[in-house]
A protein has these predicted regions:
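Inter-lobe coupling/hinge segments of SF2-like helicase ATPases
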Residues: 1-376, 410, 420, 428
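Conserved beta/loop motifs at nucleotide-recognition and modification sites
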Residues: 151, 384, 391, 445, ...
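Short helix-loop-beta junction
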Residues: 227-233, 384-392
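Generic hydrophobic alpha-helical scaffold/packing signal
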Residues: 305-308, 383, 387, 421, ...
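Short amphipathic alpha-helices in soluble, non-transmembrane regions
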Residues: 378-385, 431-440
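Short beta-strand elements
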Residues: 389-407, 448-456
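Short, low-order "capping/linker" segments at domain edges
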Residues: 410-423, 456-462
Length: 462
């Protein structure tokens, strides 16, 4: 079950589950609602994956829904991951969950050897390309032995940003407060948030300058450079630009195991299993460490660990090369060592000190509208209403209020976005407060046209 099913296919799948013809249901996030009648076990694979959280209404987390379903059906819930979420591992350590550990890798193969390459040193040696000398040599050796290479670069496009040479301002999307990305195939700038496309401007919209610098590198440029470095190797680029059609992703995977030697990915690698891949290269993940969310370290550690694990899954031992300008950062070092227990202890200490989940819940009160001054006023009014409620209702539970402030991306798809973040608990008294505050704000005529929402433990880095 997945979003690509037609209405007819989805109806057929639901009927097969309801009448018991289908004994096993497999699917993406929404499959947690599958109408299985006699539920015996519910398995959430890669339970720490961020896509299990719906950021649009209805806002829910598939793991929370799975937990409730298993309580209702009196059956076990299995949360599986090589890199569990900090919250899940915390509950396992406390004994709320039962912790089951796999001590050996599949087929008893050794973990890949990971080399961390300091890209600052590469620049000092005059190497201005995105590929370190160590990675180029390793790719050449791997290809010469008839094996395959996987490369990760989580940035689409050709150049990641275009800026003016006179004022240094980027070219922003007219609908979003986000710099646009240059795509060479279409020779256009594209916003990866709203999809807006436009040609390169002749003059800077900020100062009128006529010269621009093209900065950063994306998967399109990497594909081009790989073809120059290894002209005999067949390169497969997989990102949202090449796998946008309904079956393109599956078709690419079906052919890639036999037809390509170099694979370039821009997306998540979890679950991929290709026995001839003996080298994995992470081109750049430094920016992911500073994504504006308290989960940034966790997600970076998880992605690197999962990527490294794609190497050496066959009969030949694998290796991985991690390129970074932050070679001494503890997250990158522990990810290279694949040392989750030590990483957990580090993250545990930070979250306990800063009071982040699992030591509290975060409720994001969101305010969205076309006029910034009205959106900002609504967010400020929500803070005032919280203060009124706490005083009038003698609210004695611990509560921390952060904001009102603009969201990480203040404007998306033509709408301004502000938020108030509450550090609280997802319990009835807090939910009553949140409901009362939102109702008090929406009751005011000035804010009637705004979109307001409450999102428990959502992504604050957007």
């Amino acid at each position: 079950m997945h979003s690509a099913l037609t209405d007819r296919q989805r109806q057929d799948a639901y009927q097969r589950m309801q009448n018991g013809t289908a004994k096993i249901a497999i699917g993406t996030r929404s499959a947690v609602f599958a109408p299985v009648q006699n539920l015996g076990i519910l398995i959430v694979d890669e339970e720490g994956e961020r896509t299990y959280k719906s950021e649009n209404a209805p806002r829910y987390h598939a793991v929370a829904v799975a937990r409730k379903r298993c309580q209702t059906h009196h059956c076990p819930l299995l949360l599986a991951s090589a890199t569990p979420s900090i919250e899940s591992y915390y509950y396992a350590k406390k004994g709320v969950y039962t912790l089951l550990e796999l001590k050996k890798r599949y087929r008893n193969m050794p973990l890949p050897e990971v080399t961390v390459v300091d890209m600052n040193r590469e620049r000092q040696l005059g190497n201005g390309t995105p590929f370190s000398n160590a990675l180029i040599d390793a790719m050449q050796e791997t290809l010469s032995h008839g094996k395959q290479v996987l490369l990760l670069l989580n940035r689409r496009g050709y150049h990641t940003m275009i800026s003016c040479c006179s004022c240094n301002e980027p070219v922003y999307c007219p609908n979003c407060s986000v710099p646009m990305t240059y795509h060479k195939v279409s020779d256009q700038l594209m916003c990866h948030y709203c999809g807006h496309m436009q040609p390169m401007p002749e003059t800077c919209p900020h100062c009128g300058g006529k010269q621009f610098r093209r900065m950063g590198f994306g998967t399109q440029q990497m594909e081009e450079q790989l073809q120059l470095l290894f002209p005999k190797a067949r390169v497969l680029r997989m990102d949202a630009d090449t796998t946008g059609s309904r079956y393109a992703y599956e078709e690419s995977l079906q052919h890639s195991a036999q037809e390509y030697e170099l694979w370039l990915y821009a997306d998540d690698w979890k679950g991929l299993d290709f026995p001839d891949v003996t080298l994995v290269g992470v081109l750049s993940l430094d920016q992911a460490l500073f994504a504006g969310d308290f989960r940034s370290y966790e997600r970076t550690f998880s992605l690197i660990t999962q990527v490294v694990g794609r190497s050496g899954r066959g009969d030949t031992a694998g290796r991985a090369i991690l390129q970074t300008f932050l070679p001494n950062h503890y997250v990158l070092q522990l990810a290279a060592q694949q040392n989750y227990p030590v990483f957990y202890e580090q993250e545990y200490a930070i979250r306990k000190t800063m009071l982040f989940p699992p030591f509290c819940d975060l409720c994001i009160l969101g305010f969205v509208g076309e006029k910034e001054e009205i959106v900002a006023a609504a967010a400020a009014e929500a803070v005032r209403q919280i203060q009124v409620y706490v005083k009038e209702q003698a609210f004695s539970y611990p509560l921390w209020v952060l904001g009102a402030v603009p969201c990480h991306y203040e404007r998306l798809k033509g709408k301004y976005r502000y938020r108030v973040i509450l550090k609280c608990k997802n319990t009835s008294p807090y939910r009553t407060l949140i409901r009362a505050v939102l109702e008090a704000v929406t009751a005011q005529k000035a804010f009637a046209k705004l979109y307001l929402y409450a999102d428990m433990n959502g992504d604050i880095g957007v």
